[in-house]
Amino acid sequence: LPDSEGKIHLMFLDDVIRYCLPMIFVGMKYTDYEAYTFKFTKDAEMEMDSDLRTGVLQKISKGVKSRKKGEPIRFVYDESMPKDLLKKLTHLLNVDKSDTRVAGGRYHNFKDLMKFPDCGRKDLKYPVWPPLFKSELNGMESLITLIRQKDRSLHYPYHSFDTFIRVLREAAISKEVKSIKMTLYRLAKDSKVVKALIAAARNGKKVTVIIELLARFDEASNINWSKKLQDAGVHVIFGVEGLKIHSKLLHVSTRYGDFACISTGNFHEGNARMYTDYTIMTAHRPIVREVNYVFEFIEKPYTPIVFKELLVSPNDMRKKFITLINKEIKNKEQGKEAYILCKVNHITDKVLIEKLYAASAAGVKVDLVVRGNCSLVTGISGISENIQINGIIDRYLEHSRIFIFANNGEERYYIGSADWMPRNLDNRIEVITPVYDKEIQKDLKRIVEYGLRDTAKGRIVDGSGENRPWQTKEHTLFRSQEELYKSYKI
């Protein structure tokens, strides 16, 4: 709302309606006008049809529709609302006393601020950080050929997701490509990924897509995309009964050798502009072979497969992480170099937390970057005094999972889709891959170390629940996301 002095004033739509009530009810001869907001939340769990004659797609479609009839679980209302109006509303909405009623303020939908209007004030905005193109991957040479030469990596959103789209498009038209297999969890509204897969199928490639229909709140979108893929001749598989497919995988078979992509995040153009995720593209034969094994496991569930390179859940991921941590404990006890560096979204798995406590008690330095839920408590004498945790909330949502183990000077690096949570380790198909390329290892270590050094947007996660900011002078503040962007820009 501009004024005569050239200033711009902002107003909630709620207030526009509130102040314009006389115009809305013109001719009704009311003398007083009052308006109160409320927010009504229903249970989002889906009712799944158990009829064996019903296909998976039909079950999920029916389940999505059942959400409209979900039980009320939360009712937030303007605390100034008159009691008689509140009583009438709760009766009409069938919100009984057992439901959660929360007296709140006048505004309940602050997520709308994610679409904050452009007021022409550049000083109120983040500086523009255009996604970068890696010079090694930005020429005219075949990206598939470049991946065969050595492992390649992309770190979104610092690097452009368009490079990955180029890989898919090249695979779709290349005469040497025989088949493409891919897992899809969440997809953009106008997905270039799906369009490339459809183009590949129309060009005679054998395309198999594993699409997770139970990606929470994206079920309807995934159902729509799966139908389009099927119409184009793509072989679509709807996951494994009882296991959510959360791994981010691409396997491409060619006449001159296969390659694979393993990522920490979704193949989603929108997410790649807001989430920090890491993708490895490799022709390393043992890894590529085992990525194909994962697809075989999904197509033929519960087939016994032994993975030597990959860490795969629910197969053996927790067990292998325990082995890696135990190795650090043993090395420390023998006077060898030992430490653990990790960057994850969440740590809530009791078994792994207790193992990290054991490592700390043995003298192993454990440094973690954890954005979300963290059940690990630092600073307990004799238990966790060797554990440090930094949590970063900045312009990009920290989403990559990186694991580094000292291994007596011969560091072992891993990235993948899993957090250290029971659901990731027990109830999902997740994949973590080792990383052998020295340049990529150096990049991964820089990412974690920058995260640990972040005093501008980082918070000390110590188990108190306060997530205290670092006590650092303004001129010495270190902001990891900004410094990473600068390092990639050089």
Name each region found by the language model.
Residues 365-369:
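Hydrophobic alpha/beta core scaffold segments
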